[in-house]
């Protein structure tokens, strides 16, 4: 499959992936039901800006929640954050069933690549695959998030090279399992043409500003097409 064909396929999937859930979200009371979205991951979805400051209401789960409600005003929707700062996907996988799937989510997002550089590609893939398969087995839709950028971009060092490769790993997993992809890494790339541009989107060594969180929320929200 060519790159163009992949992009077309991804675009079509973005339109249809959540169809059954979006149809339910369009229903009015008393025919509607509660829809649960779980955001699982590390410090970024947890809302950390300049550590130890946590800016919950400027982080992408809350921004996403507002975007969803603007598009689906009749839906009762919970966006539940199960993210913990400092975690890798190994940590997140160990508590995935207990902390994330216990909410019986209709949709779960997974965001760990920034920290997964500490564990390497093989262990990261095993942990991500385990979480994906557990979610899909229970009928939960999955949207994977590629990493947001960090200050390794300025250095263009091994840390940056690893981040690029982890982003590609997440894309590969989304393609392998035919699930959703929120390409945060690509969204940052579209808005940053020179090093000084990153200051608008980076609040800390490796945490986005609100503007950076908006980019992530928009990537996820592309699956929530208003009816």
Walk through the language-model features, giving the residues of each.
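Internal alpha/beta domain cores that form substrate/cofactor-binding pockets in large enzymes
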Residues: 36-38, 69, 74-103, 115-145
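Alpha-helical structural signal in soluble globular domains
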Residues: 63-71, 99, 130, 134, ...
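A short acidic, helix-capping loop that chelates divalent metal ions and anchors anionic groups
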Residues: 46-50, 88-90, 116-119, 151-156
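Serine-esterase "nucleophile elbow" of acetyl-processing enzymes
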Residues: 7-82, 95-104
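Cell-envelope and extracellular/periplasmic
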Residues: 44, 52, 81-87, 109-117, ...
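Active-site segments of SGNH/GDSL-like serine hydrolases
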Residues: 111-115, 131-167
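Alpha-helix N-cap and loop-to-helix initiation/capping positions
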Residues: 52-59, 122-123, 127, 158-165, ...
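Catalytic His-Asp segment of secreted/periplasmic serine-dependent ester chemistry enzymes
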Residues: 12, 22, 148-227
């Amino acid at each position: 499959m060519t790159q163009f064909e992949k992009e077309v396929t991804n675009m079509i999937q973005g339109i249809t992936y959540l169809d059954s859930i979006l149809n339910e979200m369009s229903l009015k009371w008393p025919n509607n039901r509660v829809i649960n979205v779980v955001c699982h991951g590390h410090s970024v979805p947890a809302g950390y800006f300049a550590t130890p400051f946590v800016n919950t209401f400027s982080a992408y789960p809350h921004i996403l929640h507002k975007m969803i409600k603007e598009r689906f005003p009749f839906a009762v929707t919970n966006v539940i954050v199960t993210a913990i700062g400092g975690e890798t996907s190994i940590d997140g996988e160990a508590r995935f069933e207990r902390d994330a799937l216990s909410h019986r989510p209709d949709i779960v997002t997974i965001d760990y690549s920034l920290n997964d550089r500490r564990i390497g590609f093989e262990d990261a893939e095993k942990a991500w695959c385990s979480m994906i398969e557990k979610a899909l087995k229970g009928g939960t839709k999955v949207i994977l998030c590629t990493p947001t950028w960090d200050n390794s971009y300025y250095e263009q060092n091994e840390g940056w090279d690893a981040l690029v490769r982890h982003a590609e790993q997440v894309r590969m997993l989304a393609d392998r399992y035919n699930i959703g992809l929120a390409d945060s890494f690509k969204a940052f790339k579209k808005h940053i043409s020179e090093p000084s541009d990153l200051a608008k989107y980076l609040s800390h060594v490796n945490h986005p500003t609100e503007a950076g969180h908006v980019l992530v929320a928009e990537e996820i929200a592309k699956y929530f097409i208003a009816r």
